[in-house]
């Protein structure tokens, strides 16, 4: 009854107005699953590869080739398979692709099918996706990392770091956490406006003011937290996504906005000082993706008191994560389903992290859709943390709204991760 009888891929638009892949899967009993694939702006060199069309259509970013793969090769390979055999289906697609980075079929084609299959199987079983994937123990609502000021590749301003985030660690529920975030977001908007800054929002819903450096951004956020009636570090902690690969040149970190250059040791010391001065509890990609020595130095310096998250470093890849674990590098992994390209491999990366004592953070991409799958996956894996943008733009709030629904559905079983999500707090 859960055999796959139809797969339909189509080209839709993401939140940046670029094409992406959406997939529908239909089972023999009529169960249905739909998934849309996200896309990143700052991408790691070791990520799985999207299949794009090239040429003039959509300025080369069309995905008709990927859609053709879904409707042709992939359908032929898995039609008739049991949708509940997720591992087997994902492995069939990986083998069919045959490359190390999913460059033949395209990670966007494979992932769309992988997620849609899981959703169809969940519907067939009469379970919500988080329960189908995570089992009876899926009950932890994640602390959101809310990106409220943007810089780097996500903005046209002098700030070199890509994201400045707030984490409502002192809230008692996801519903309350979202309220904390919203109140700080709107307070920050007013303070920026009063100071003469533009308050338009960027790709992830955060503000992109013309501030001179990271400290100026952090000062605005700290003041806004206090003005909104919260205590920095107690009610709401701070986080950074440096996206350091984007400004790593010839072995150094080149801060064009600040007109400063820092070698890896100076970079680590700079981050350590920021963490100490501003209640920063998590730093993502503080070092470049292939600067393993720099990562090791940073981890040795502050890894016992600050969550150090590998995004471009690990690219949701269990093999790269195991390298990091062996070298004692970082202490957390960012989990992006499209970096690795299948649900099974995503779950494997989270499991690998947890077994090694690393934390895991479920994450969106800067190019998103209304698809809220990652909210369910955050609860399914009990990872305790989620990155899904600011408190604006429906492509971001869709995930928060889904978490609120899940919390309501779980009732007394629900537990908000709070401070325990970051093992060092």
Swiss-Prot record:
Gene3D superfamilies: Enolase-like C-terminal domain (3.20.20.120), Enolase-like, N-terminal domain (3.30.390.10). GO terms for biological process: glycolytic process. Pathway: Carbohydrate degradation; glycolysis; pyruvate from D-glyceraldehyde 3-phosphate: step 4/5. CDD domains: enolase. The active site is at residues 204, 336. It is found in: Cytoplasm; Secreted; Cell surface. GO terms for molecular function: magnesium ion binding; phosphopyruvate hydratase activity. It comes from the Bacteria. Its EC number is 4.2.1.11. Binds a second Mg(2+) ion via substrate during catalysis. Keywords: Cytoplasm, Glycolysis, Lyase, Magnesium, Metal-binding, Secreted. (2R)-2-phosphoglycerate binds at residues 162, 336, 365-366, 387. It catalyses: (2R)-2-phosphoglycerate = phosphoenolpyruvate + H2O. Its cofactor is Mg(2+). Catalyzes the reversible conversion of 2-phosphoglycerate (2-PG) into phosphoenolpyruvate (PEP). It is essential for the degradation of carbohydrates via glycolysis. This is Enolase. It comes from Brucella suis (strain ATCC 23445 / NCTC 10510). The gene is eno.
């Amino acid at each position: 009854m859960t055999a796959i009888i139809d797969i339909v891929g189509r080209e839709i638009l993401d939140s940046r107005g670029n094409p992406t892949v959406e997939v529908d899967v239909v089972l023999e009993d009529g169960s249905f699953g739909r998934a849309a694939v996200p896309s990143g702006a700052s991408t790691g060199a070791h990520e799985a590869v999207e299949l794009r069309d090239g040429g003039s259509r959509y300025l080369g970013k069309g995905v008709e080739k990927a859609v053709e793969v879904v409707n042709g090769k992939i359908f032929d390979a898995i039609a008739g398979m049991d949708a509940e055999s997720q591992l087997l289906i994902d492995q069939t697609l990986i083998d069919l692709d045959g490359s190390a980075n999913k460059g033949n079929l395209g990670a966007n084609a494979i992932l769309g099918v992988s997620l849609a299959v899981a959703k169809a199987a969940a519907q067939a079983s009469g379970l919500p996706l988080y329960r189908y994937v995570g089992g009876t123990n899926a009950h932890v609502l994640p602390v959101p990392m809310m990106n409220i000021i943007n810089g780097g590749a996500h903005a046209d301003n002098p700030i070199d770091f890509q994201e400045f985030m707030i984490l409502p660690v002192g809230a008692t529920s996801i519903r309350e956490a979202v309220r904390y975030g919203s109140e700080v977001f709107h307070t920050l908007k007013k303070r920026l406006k009063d100071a003469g800054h533009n308050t338009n929002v960027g790709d992830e819903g955060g503000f992109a003011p013309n501030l001179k450096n990271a400290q100026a951004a952090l000062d605005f956020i700290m003041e806004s937290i206090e003005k909104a009636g919260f205590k920095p570090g107690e009610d709401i902690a701070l986080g950074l996504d440096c996206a350091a690969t984007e400004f790593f040149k010839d072995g150094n970190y080149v801060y064009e906005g600040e007109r400063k250059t820092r070698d890896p040791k100076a970079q680590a010391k700079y981050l350590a000082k920021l963490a100490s001065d501003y209640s920063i509890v998590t730093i993502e990609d503080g070092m470049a993706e292939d600067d393993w020595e720099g990562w090791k130095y940073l981890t040795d310096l502050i890894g016992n008191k600050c969550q150090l998250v590998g995004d471009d470093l690990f690219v949701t890849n269990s093999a790269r994560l195991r390298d990091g674990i062996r070298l004692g590098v970082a202490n957390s992994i960012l989990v992006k389903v499209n970096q690795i390209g299948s649900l099974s491999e995503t779950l494997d990366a989270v499991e690998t992290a947890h077994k090694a004592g690393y934390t895991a953070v479920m994450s969106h991409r800067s190019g998103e859709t209304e698809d809220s799958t990652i909210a369910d996956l955050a609860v399914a894996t009990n990872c305790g943390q989620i990155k899904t943008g600011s408190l604006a733009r429906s492509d971001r709030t869709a995930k928060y709204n889904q978490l609120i629904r899940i919390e309501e559905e779980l009732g007394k079983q629900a537990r908000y991760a709070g401070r325990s999500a970051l093992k060092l707090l």
